[in-house]
């Protein structure tokens, strides 16, 4: 099997590491057998070479092997809303807000997230600020999903083997393969996904990685203004996997009867500001904050196969917010997590 040094040499020569070799290397990383220096060198080498679909798929396969799973038997309408982060947009937590709307409209949300890496606040940070207990055991996450329609999986609890790469990733401070693996490794095995990415090239790559990994219905999105969400300020590039086939296209807010907004109205400087945006959106306060949530929740409902199109998903999302169902879903989720954790 390939040695660490031979793999590094391969990246220096801009040659691909084959599937079985990548499986071997990633297992060495996840089991603590590879040195921090070599982890860093290999991660940077892959980044400079540009990671291939096969390399990413192999690495994600191993990360899934080492993950602590959430026991969910029924995966119908089970969807994850997450992003790679790293878009430096400093917006409020759009996908986290959208999950309450999507769940209220009939999706079952298995959200995989953590604390802030590049944003003002990560999904874990803002959920805690909303009063939720995020540190649940896998069986408790499954119970929360069954009771509230949402299960939040705090990434460090489900990927303990990532501790070997964590310090290296933090010290490097640049994007590597580890930044794009998280959204590919949902511990509940959600086969449906709305994933935002930080670069347009990743749209075609990530959707094809998920195709190889056996996902059911996926939308990988990149707002052409630089957001890792579906944007309200112009076009969004989408890679869609459905029925085993991949297609790429662009959408515009006007396609769904939504106005175009500047992104400045979505920016926040703190976790508390993000919480304020979430509450305003769920209270049906008109404006860009609510509308970007409706758009992304609509896409999540389409990815979850609850809605037959993004447009119909937006209509269902609008109804869930206007009726108060989305706000009630947030309250129910928070109460359920606190009861399960014993914090109520």
Curated annotation (Swiss-Prot):
Its cofactor is Mg(2+). Binds 2 magnesium ions per monomer. Its EC number is 2.4.2.18. Keywords: Amino-acid biosynthesis, Aromatic amino acid biosynthesis, Glycosyltransferase, Magnesium, Metal-binding, Transferase, Tryptophan biosynthesis. Anthranilate 2 binds at residue 169. GO terms for cellular component: cytosol. SUPFAM superfamilies: Nucleoside phosphorylase/phosphoribosyltransferase catalytic domain, Nucleoside phosphorylase/phosphoribosyltransferase N-terminal domain. It is an enzyme of class 2 (transferase). One of its GO terms (biological process) is L-tryptophan biosynthetic process. Mg(2+) 1 binds at residues 95, 229. Mg(2+) 2 binds at residues 228-229. The keyword Metal-binding applies. 5-phospho-alpha-D-ribose 1-diphosphate binds at residues 83, 86-87, 91, 93-96, 111-119, 123. HAMAP family: TrpD. Catalyzes the transfer of the phosphoribosyl group of 5-phosphorylribose-1-pyrophosphate (PRPP) to anthranilate to yield N-(5'-phosphoribosyl)-anthranilate (PRA). Belongs to the anthranilate phosphoribosyltransferase family. This is Anthranilate phosphoribosyltransferase.
């Amino acid at each position: 099997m390939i040695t660490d040094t031979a793999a590094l040499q391969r990246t220096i020569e801009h040659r691909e590491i084959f599937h079985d070799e990548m499986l071997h290397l990633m297992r060495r990383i996840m089991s603590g057998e590879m040195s921090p220096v070599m982890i860093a060198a290999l991660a940077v080498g892959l980044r400079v070479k540009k990671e291939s679909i096969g390399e990413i798929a192999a690495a994600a396969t191993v990360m899934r092997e080492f993950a602590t799973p959430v026991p969910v038997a029924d995966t119908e309408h089970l969807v994850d809303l997450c992003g790679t982060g790293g878009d430096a947009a400093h917006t409020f937590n759009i996908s986290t807000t959208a999950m309450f709307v999507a769940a209220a409209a009939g999706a079952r949300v298995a959200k995989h997230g953590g604390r802030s890496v590049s944003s003002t606040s990560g999904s874990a940070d803002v959920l805690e600020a909303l009063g939720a207990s995020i540190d649940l055991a896998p069986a408790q996450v499954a119970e929360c999903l069954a009771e509230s329609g949402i299960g939040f999986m705090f990434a460090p609890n489900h990927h303990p083997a990532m501790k070997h790469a964590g310090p290296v990733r933090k010290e490097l401070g640049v994007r590597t393969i580890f930044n794009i693996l998280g959204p590919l490794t949902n511990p509940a095995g959600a086969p449906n996904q709305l994933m935002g990415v930080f670069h347009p090239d990743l749209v075609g790559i990530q959707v094809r990685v998920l195709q190889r990994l056996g996902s059911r219905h996926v939308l990988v999105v990149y707002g052409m203004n630089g957001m890792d969400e579906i944007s309200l300020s112009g076009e969004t590039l989408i890679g869609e996997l459905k029925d085993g086939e991949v297609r790429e296209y662009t959408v515009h807010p006007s396609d769904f009867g939504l106005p175009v907004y500047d992104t400045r109205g979505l920016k926040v400087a703190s976790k508390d500001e993000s919480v304020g945006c979430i509450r305003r959106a769920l209270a049906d306060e008109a404006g860009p904050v609510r509308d970007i949530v409706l758009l992304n929740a609509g896409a999540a409902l389409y990815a979850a196969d609850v809605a037959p199109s993004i447009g119909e998903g937006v209509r269902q999302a609008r109804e869930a917010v206007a009726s108060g169902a989305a706000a009630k879903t947030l309250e129910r989720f928070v109460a359920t997590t606190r009861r399960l954790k014993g914090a109520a």
